[in-house]
Amino acid sequence: MSFNTIIDWNSCTAEQQRQLLMRPAISASESITRTVNDILDNVKTRGDEALREYSAKFDKTTVTALKVSADEIAAASERLSDELKQAMAVAVKSIETFHTAQKLPPVDVETQLGVRCQQVTRPVASVGLYIPGGSAPLFSTVLMLATPARIAGCKKVVLCSPPPIADEILYAAQLCDVQDVFNVGGAQAIAALAFGTESVPKVDKIFGPGNAFVTEAKRQVSQRLDGAAIDMPAGPSEVLVIADSGATPDFVASDLLSQAEHGPDSQVILLTPDADMARRVAEAVERQLAELPRAETTRQALNASRLIVTKDLAQCVEISNQYGPEHLIIQTRNARELVDGITSAGSVFLGDWSPESAGDYASGTNHVLPTYGYTATCSSLGLADFQKRMTVQELSKEGFSALASTIETLAAAERLTAHKNAVTLRVNVLKEQA
C-alpha cells in the first residue's frame, strides 16, 4: 500500500483497522541474541583487550587510547563554528529550564499523630550515555541526556560512542559537563558500561539509542544481576498527526517527512476527518520528498505509513490513543482542546508553529521518548529517570502505640509471626516502662 492511498477508517472491518495500526515488525534474531551474549561475556572477562578487538572488527579502527583526552576535546571545539556552538547553548538553556522545573518537593507528612512519613529523592550515582556514530552524529541526544543528569546531581556521567567520535558529540559532552568520553561503540560499549573494564567505569544505569545490537545488549544487561538498569525499551521512530481542514498541508507533510527520514523502519500516520486534506498532504509529501537528500530511505518508511480519513476529530483522538504514538502532532483550529482526551503519547505538539523538530532540539522537552506502543505504560525521559525516590518513617512512642494493635492484627492474618513479634516485644517494653 503506497502512502498516497487514502483509507476510509469507517469502511474498514475491525481486523483491517487493527492491521492499519500495526507497526513494522522488530525482533532480535537468534543470531543477534547469541552474538550480543558472547560480546557481553567476552568484555566482562577480558575488558579493554576485548573492546579493542571489537573496534578493529566492527568499526575498522585501531584504538590505542580508549579514553578521549582533554586535548582532543579542545581541538574538536576549535573546529566547530561559533554559530553551532551558540545554537547548542540555546538548546541546553531550554532543556535545563524545563528539566529543572521537574524537581519534586520533598514529601513530609504525619499520617497520624506521632507517625511521620517522608519521601526524598536522591540521584542515580553513576550513569552511562551511549551515542551512536555514523554519518549523522546525534549530538542533540548528548544534550538531552547529559543535561538532566547534571541537574539530578549524578556524581559520575560518562559517554561512549563509536570511533572516530564526531566533533559535535565531543563538544556537546564538554558543554554538558560529561566527565569522561570513551572511543567504544556497539554492544561492546554497553557491556563496558554495565560491567566495567580497566578504562571504562561500571555505571548504575545506561541511557541512549542504538542499532539492533545495542538495543539487544541493553535488554540483556538489564536482566542480569551483575548488569545495569536502562532508560526504556527502544523501537523505530514514529509520528502521528491529527489535522483538520484548517491545517496547512505543507506543514503537515514536512512533519511527516521529518520523522520518516530517520530510517526505513520509521512509521508516520495522518488522521483527518477531511478527505481533501489527506489528498493535499499526499501531494505535498511527494513535492517535498523529491528535494530530500535522504529520499530513498524516507520513501521506504512511507511504505509502512498511513493516510486515514475519520468521521470526526473525536474519532481521531480515539484512534491515536489506541496507537499510542511516540510523537503526536495536533494541527487543528483548537488544538489544545484535544489534549485532555489524549491518554497515550510520548510528546505532543500543538498548533501550526510547533513542529516536531522543536522538541527534537530546542523547545526544552526531552526527545528521548517511548516508541512502539510503550506510551501505554512508559513516559518521556525526564529528571526522574536520573533519580530514585526513598521513603523515611519515624514513629514516636505514642505513634507506635496507636498503630501497634493494627500491625499485630495484619501480621497475624498473613501468618508472619516474626513481623508480629517485632511489634509485640516493643509493646511489652512500653508496658513495663509505664
UniProtKB/Swiss-Prot annotation:
* An annotated GO cellular component: cytosol
Entry EC number(s): 1.1.1.23
Active site: which residues?
Answer: 326-327
| Protein name as it appears in the record | Histidinol dehydrogenase
Residues reported to bind Zn(2+):
259, 262, 360, 419
Q: In which pathway does it act?
A: Amino-acid biosynthesis; L-histidine biosynthesis; L-histidine from 5-phospho-alpha-D-ribose 1-diphosphate: step 9/9
**NCBIfam families the record matches:** hisD
An example Gene Ontology molecular-function term:
zinc ion binding
Q: Provide the reaction this enzyme catalyses.
A: L-histidinol + 2 NAD(+) + H2O = L-histidine + 2 NADH + 3 H(+)
**Cofactor, free-text remark:** Binds 1 zinc ion per subunit.
Q: Which biological process terms from the Gene Ontology are attached to this UniProt entry?
A: L-histidine biosynthetic process
Give the UniProt family note: Belongs to the histidinol dehydrogenase family.
Question: Which keywords fit this entry according to its UniProt record?
Answer: Amino-acid biosynthesis, Histidine biosynthesis, Metal-binding, NAD, Oxidoreductase, Zinc
What this protein is reported to do is described as:
Catalyzes the sequential NAD-dependent oxidations of L-histidinol to L-histidinaldehyde and then to L-histidine.
Which cofactors must be present for this protein to function?
A: Zn(2+)
Q: Which CDD domains match?
A: Histidinol_dh
Q: Which domain of life is it from?
A: Bacteria
Q: Which residues bind substrate?
A: 237, 259, 262, 327, 360, 414, 419
Which InterPro entries does the annotation name?
A: Ald_DH/histidinol_DH, Histidinol_DH_CS, Histidinol_DH_monofunct, Hstdl_DH
Q: Describe its partners and assembly state.
A: Homodimer.
Q: Can you tell me which residues bind NAD(+)? A: 130, 188, 211
Enzyme kind, highest EC tier: oxidoreductase
